[in-house]
């Protein structure tokens, strides 16, 4: 029996913005005699809490606790009204959404949250001056795309405040996942007067933020290793928030988390590799599949080795994903041979999963890889050296060392140099396109297939690897506009786009679909694991006897 003395939560995650469901609770009755305080460890510092700029899922997990929007996800990842007081009114053609806000929706300073706060936040997101990496999220909103490229003013965005408590959105095409999309903190409101009063200091630390979610953050500034979450006393559903304090700190070493869990100093920590098998029968073990793609990304900048298609194809065919997941990781991850992970989207007309529909690409083929490698050597020379950018945590170490060994063994003359960096630096290097090979992952904000294909659209802020193909772009646009209401045609568009991306362009090498594995103190109940957006959610969590 473990002695639960210091109660701590540890988050360890791979990549950018997995599973679903929640622990069974014992009702909403607060346990008597237990101090409702926990601590949280994260593998990297929080990058930015400006919701227009947040991209990594680790930071976003905390942001989701601080900023609530019109809707939020329930324990089954179903969108339900948040700051909206009731379900949205949707026009028959699916193009107009009208939301009525809660009269008691307030900012953490007590000011009323208004429809104008949503207008401001959404306009700010698509404003080219903001340079928001997530601006594409509103591409379904009228005039958003034209505003993003500077062809129209932000005031033309299809959003309207009808008084203080009614917010209306005009779409250019129906979007089945729209309510899920607006449940993510990227589209939470911002208080214009407050933001502008802070100037460049907005979101630089906890003193220069306002909060609309169940918690506020204290004692945080960019780059700091520690911070504290406390209940937002102005939150409309304050009585449902049981935890009184969540202390956060940065811990990178998985071994450390497991050791502290076993001594009772942590009450939730993530597992991977051999630890999963070791603890699989432990009553505290919890596992669920992530809807995510972990991949090897190529920077195809002209004039660099990886601009060579033969080199990219040789690398793609020379990685044994079965061995990677079974031996190097051994944590429940599954090989992935496509851009889209399993269970992201299922065709409601025939229950066919897109991954099964689209088929497999870049499957391990050692001999074919060697043949293409010989062609690459004719183009580039016998000896080629490539740096591999990875995060400096346990997962990054395991994956990169496996890939290094596999490629150097299967492709004689290729040298892979691992360059580990803190995850925040990795993300910045990718944004700056300052890499050649990198390990990354993508976990979309909702179940829209387009959330993955946006990664490689020519003008996408996430297109770090300089992939560009006009046919791919046309198919991606057709799928989310012309064929948005016909899933069968949409599937066909996306399948053709995926083939161009992987079979023809070799833009990335899909590696695996990850699993999240935890040891959890059974005294924590009500903890939720959303399918989209964040790793977990503590709004309804509490400690029980």
Which residues does each predicted region cover?
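N-terminal lobe/hinge region of extracytoplasmic solute-binding protein
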Residues: 41-92, 210
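Alpha-helical secondary-structure segments
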Residues: 114-116, 120-121, 166-168, 243-245, ...
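Surface-exposed binding/hinge segments that line
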Residues: 134-193
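Gly/Pro-rich hinge or "lid" segments in bacterial periplasmic/extracellular proteins
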Residues: 171, 175-241, 245, 255
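Ligand-site clamp/hinge motif
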Residues: 234-278
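Structural transition elements
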Residues: 334-375, 395-397
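Extracytoplasmic/peripheral linker and loop segments enriched in polar/acidic and small residues
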Residues: 361-362, 413-426, 453-521, 545
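Long beta-strand-rich cores associated with HINT superfamily self-processing modules
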Residues: 518-545
């Amino acid at each position: 029996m473990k002695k639960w003395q210091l109660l701590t939560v540890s988050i360890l995650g791979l990549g950018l913005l997995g599973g679903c469901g929640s622990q069974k609770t014992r009702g909403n009755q607060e346990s008597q005699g237990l101090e409702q305080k926990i601590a949280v460890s994260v593998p990297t510092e929080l990058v930015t809490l400006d919701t227009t700029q947040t991209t990594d899922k680790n930071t976003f997990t905390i942001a989701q606790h601080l900023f609530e929007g019109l809707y939020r996800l329930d324990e089954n990842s179903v969108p339900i009204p948040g700051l909206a007081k009731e379900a949205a009114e949707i026009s028959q053609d699916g193009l107009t959404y009208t939301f009525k806000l809660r009269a008691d929706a307030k900012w953490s300073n007590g000011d009323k949250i208004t429809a104008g706060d949503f207008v401001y936040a959404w306009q700010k997101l698509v404003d080219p001056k903001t340079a928001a990496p997530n601006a594409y999220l509103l591409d379904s909103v009228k005039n958003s795309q034209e505003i993003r490229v500077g062809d129209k003013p932000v005031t033309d965005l299809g959003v309207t405040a009808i008084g203080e408590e009614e917010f209306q959105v005009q779409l250019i095409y129906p979007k089945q996942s729209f309510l899920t999309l607006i449940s993510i903190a990227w589209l939470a409101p911002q208080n214009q007067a407050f933001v502008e009063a802070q100037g460049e200091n907005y979101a630089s630390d906890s003193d220069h933020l306002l909060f609309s979610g169940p918690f506020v953050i204290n004692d945080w500034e960019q780059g700091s290793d520690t911070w504290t979450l406390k209940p937002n006393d102005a939150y409309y559903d304050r009585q449902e928030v049981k935890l009184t304090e969540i202390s956060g700190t940065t811990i990178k070493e998985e071994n450390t988390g497991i050791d502290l869990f076993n001594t009772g100093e942590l009450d939730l920590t993530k597992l991977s590799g051999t630890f999963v098998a070791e603890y699989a029968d432990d009553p505290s073990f919890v596992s669920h599949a992530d809807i995510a793609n972990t991949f090897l990304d190529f920077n195809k900048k002209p004039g660099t080795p990886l601009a060579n298609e033969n080199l990219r194809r040789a690398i793609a065919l020379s990685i044994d994903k079965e061995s990677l997941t079974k031996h190097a990781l051994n944590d429940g991850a599954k090989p992935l041979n496509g851009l889209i992970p399993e269970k992201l989207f299922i065709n409601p007309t025939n229950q066919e999963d897109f991954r099964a529909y689209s088929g497999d690409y870049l499957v391990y083929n050692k001999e074919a890889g060697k043949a293409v490698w010989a062609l690459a050597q004719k183009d580039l020379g016998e000896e080629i050296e490539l740096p591999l950018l990875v995060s400096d945590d346990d997962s990054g170490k395991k994956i990169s060392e496996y890939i290094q060994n596999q490629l150097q063994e299967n492709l004689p003359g290729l040298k892979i140099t691992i360059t580990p960096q803190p995850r925040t630096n990795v993300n910045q290097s990718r944004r700056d396109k300052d890499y050649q090979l990198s390990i990354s992952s993508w976990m979309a904000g909702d179940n829209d297939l387009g959330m993955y294909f946006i990664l490689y659209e020519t003008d996408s802020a996430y297109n770090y690897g300089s992939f560009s193909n006009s046919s791919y772009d046309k198919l991606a646009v057709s799928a989310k506009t012309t064929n948005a209401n016909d899933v069968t045609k949409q599937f066909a568009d996306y399948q053709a786009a995926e083939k161009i991306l992987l079979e023809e362009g070799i833009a990335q090498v899909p590696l695996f679909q990850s699993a999240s594995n935890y040891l959890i103190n059974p005294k924590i109940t009500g903890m939720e694991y959303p399918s989209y957006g964040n790793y977990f959610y503590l709004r309804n969590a509490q400690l029980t006897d």
